[in-house]
């Protein structure tokens, strides 16, 4: 675990599908986290001096310790679809990063000057807070997945440290060793003053020199480092966020493409050779992934702690920053000056460099404001006062606004592992800047291609329009001939129609005359017919009246005869009725006599019956008295029942 944390190897072989961040970024963050953890643990100790403050500017670019120590270049594959598939942190990682930033942002950064007041910092923080979240999202979209290819690091003896490097293992493979923190020496300002004018250009042979292997740490140091690393896990995630936001802010150089590796030496921080882009464009047209070899940059330190106002204005003009940018983003004022190429360039190179600086300016302005707001927004979140180390005269050059390495050291430690961390961070930033410039160039090429495609489409549309006009003219001529033919045909049709109309009119006149004649004959025929019908009806009516009169006469004679017969029958019926009445009266009288006789006989029978009933009652009384003296009913022999009189 400790070997992986403090390894000097820049990258291991990892699949980009298995992780969203490269091993290079993980190792860089681990090294920075370990250093900041040690500084935080020793922040409250009383045995440190302001002279022991270690910053990136204290290391000379041309010192004897650094002249023979060269990092081996790493190839970073850039896929063609990196813009479309840019990695984004997951929800859990983003949440953890935001929580860690709120706790450790102030510890990892130092103020730009000792004279800055808390009120000014609060003003800057208040202005930058509303836009921090949106800028974080924009920075997260610009992170690009890189697939590093591991390289074998040969072992070379270091003359600056004076110690022998560890050899290869028995199996022949190189095993990365951690950097001991007690090996580096602190560079003095006198060395920087002696060698300020050393040339900043490095050839590919110098840049690709192997890195010496450093001896491993002892067991106790590894245990303490593991303990500090486990306690500061949140700080690692916060540094990841600040690293991604500040990596766009610096403008280092020193990255070349594989095609231009043998042709062009590496320029200063802002210089870009034209052969790089020629090779990159050829690789992009071939559709293959581009390998960008990043080399060790030169880190420049200002000679004095404070820079004059004229020098600051010149550096701002060279770096492409304006006063408005510096006022809106306070962290740009404390960032190192931008170095411009001193050698004269050709017109083609100048045009290419101008285009690249414009692209860098837009990227730096956008990301620097986001990183500045992130760092200043955490100043208000500190509830209690914390002990601060004095601000250094110089600021770090490798991560822009991330000031993890600008804190005081409690004890004198070796500076060579810290120097390796600085170099690693600078290499990563140079690679990232080159990659961003390359992507901007690809965007420009795509825009040019789209513009060419648009022009071709417009030309095609114009050709189609001309063809359409020509076809329209041909169609128009053909249509005129067709119209003449149709007009002649219409005239012929109208002539024939007029002739047929005249013939029809003549026929119609003849038909009207014939109709008038037929009408007169018809009227005469109808008059004769009506006269005959009237005469026939008159004769018929007369005959009917005569028949009715005869019928009426016959009916009268028949009625008289019927009335006579009716009167005779009525008289006969009256006589019969009188006879019937007499018979009924006789029957009634006979019935009355019979009723009287029956009543008298009934009365006699009733008296006889009553008499007989009285006799029977007397006999019953006599029999009941006799029957009361009879024997009792039978009972079983087992029981004896008393006799009762019923």
Curated annotation (Swiss-Prot):
The modification Phosphotyrosine is found at residue 12. One of its GO terms (cellular component) is aster. Keywords: Acetylation, Cell cycle, Cell division, Coiled coil, Cytoplasm, Cytoskeleton, Microtubule, Mitosis, Phosphoprotein. It is found in: Cytoplasm; Cytoplasm, Cytoskeleton; Cytoplasm, Cytoskeleton, Spindle. Transmembrane segments: none annotated. Residues 75-226, 242-418, 491-511, 531-554, 570-597, 609-646 are annotated as: Disordered. Binds to purified microtubules via its C-terminus. This is Microtubule-associated protein 9. It comes from Mus musculus. The gene is Map9.
